[in-house]
């Protein structure tokens, strides 16, 4: 099974291709663009990963994104409501990008994937969204040498949780 993981639209966009549980290639977009902390869609990183695996987009089984935008949007709305009227200015500055792009992330990702070299426009793989911290945890656990481990993620931002704990099992 070939799975492409994508991180984009935040600091350090990147792509990683995993085949049957083994990392085939992983690279940040800034390695190609020479733009530090490049947040754009990682088209060149994806192309590199696909090239290393010897496949095209249409041969991927799954493409996964590191975040669940609707869950994050819910957190933002509830946070702004809880801090009204103090956070109103911040709310107004954040909403345009959410209403224009982030709530339509699935469509945007599909559009971007269709621009990757070798993509057959009507043959996109399944697109999944993982929870932000689950993405951190799985990327730490699965490449590790352990069959079973406690996995702690401490991060200041995500959908809701900031310090989740999991039990990793092969």
What are these regions (language model features)?
Residues 1-170:
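Short acidic/glycine-rich loops and adjacent helix/strand connectors
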């Amino acid at each position: 099974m070939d799975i492409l993981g994508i991180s984009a639209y935040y600091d350090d966009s990147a792509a990683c291709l995993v085949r049957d549980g083994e990392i085939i290639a992983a690279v940040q977009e800034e390695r190609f663009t020479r733009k530090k902390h490049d947040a754009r869609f990682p088209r060149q990183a994806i192309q590199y990963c696909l090239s290393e695996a010897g496949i095209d987009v249409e041969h991927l089984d799954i493409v996964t994104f590191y975040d669940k935008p609707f869950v994050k949007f819910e957190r933002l709305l509830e946070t702004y409501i809880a801090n009204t009227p103090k956070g109103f200015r911040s709310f107004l500055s954040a909403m345009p990008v959410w209403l224009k792009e982030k709530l339509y992330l699935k469509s945007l990702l599909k559009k971007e994937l269709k621009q990757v070299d070798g993509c057959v426009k009507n043959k996109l793989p399944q697109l999944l969204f993982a929870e932000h911290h689950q993405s951190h945890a799985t990327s730490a656990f699965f490449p590790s040498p352990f069959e079973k481990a406690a996995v702690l993620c401490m991060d200041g931002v995500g959908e809701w949780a900031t310090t989740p704990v999991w039990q990793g099992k092969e």
